Amino acid sequence: MVWKWLGALVVFPLQMIYLVTKAAVGMVLPPKLRDLSRESVLITGGGRGIGRHLAREFAERGARKIVLWGRTEKCLKETTEEIRQMGTECHYFICDVGNREEVYQMAKAVREKVGDITILVNNAAVVHGKSLMDSDDDALLKSQHVNTLGQFWTTKAFLPRMLELQNGHIVCLNSVLALSAIPGAIDYCTSKASAFAFMESLTLGLLDCPGVSATTVLPFHTSTEMFQGMRVRFPNLFPPLKPETVARRTVDAVQQNQALLLLPWTMNILIILKSILPQAALEEIHRFSGTYTCMNTFKGRT
């Protein structure tokens, strides 16, 4: 028993060195990309914003079928028609992911009409942009139901079949606010932090599930209607991301089987700073960068 324990202690650091070296080499050499030609992709919140750009990106890269879920039929119709004109089979279903029964019902309808889903992109989200004391209780609940619990329901609906097929990918379009919250968006930050923990646990739980993996994307502020009006102190230094950039990098991560993606890459520094700086220093960074007051001009949509 002692020798086995000592052997494990010796092997473990060697494994770490190998894995770090492998990752470093992978950053230099072009990785092997996943072929999407046989994949059926379902995108929640797929009618507009990042969801629409994700549909375009998957279609351009040869996805076999694309399914869009959302609450606004007009937007879903527009995106569906655009994807069909690109030559890709596309369907849409009106579905509120915050409604568990509706998710399970629509998932059944998708399987009957379209077939098996092999890539699930949890993109749907809402934000109300208020402090805790200014927030309506129902609005707070809605954020948790859509942004967090909605991912529980969609994943439970589609993951079992992926495991049977030994082919699947769960994608979470999260936010860097999951790691660094700001005032004025307490509902959104809380729900995104919870969704991040959900994906972290799910990703580890899939380690011994061949052919099935997960990707979490944490982008900085993106120039969509959702956060319209949000302003940082130095917009030229911290410009918002373009939704097409987020979509492109997300599909890259799926094809490369990348578990975690922060956008832009400088957001990785945020993790380091939060682990080494005292709270007072972190608070001063929020004041200096303008994130402390960036939601004061918020006009976005829910």
UniProtKB/Swiss-Prot annotation:
It catalyses: all-trans-retinol + NADP(+) = all-trans-retinal + NADPH + H(+). The keyword Membrane applies. Substrate binds at residue 175. The keyword Cell membrane does not apply. It is a multi-pass membrane protein. One of its GO terms (cellular component) is membrane. The active site is at residue 188. Pfam families: adh_short. GO terms for biological process: bone morphogenesis; cardiac septum morphogenesis; negative regulation of retinoic acid receptor signaling pathway; outflow tract morphogenesis; regulation of ossification; retinoid metabolic process; roof of mouth development. Its EC number is 1.1.1.300. Its main location: membrane. GO terms for molecular function: all-trans-retinol dehydrogenase (NAD+) activity; all-trans-retinol dehydrogenase (NADP+) activity. In the embryo, expressed in developing osteogenic and chondrogenic tissues of vertebra, rib, tooth and limb bud. Keywords: Lipid metabolism, Membrane, NADP, Oxidoreductase, Transmembrane, Transmembrane helix. It is found in: Membrane. Catalyzes the reduction of all-trans-retinal to all-trans-retinol in the presence of NADPH. This is Short-chain dehydrogenase/reductase 3. The gene is Dhrs3.
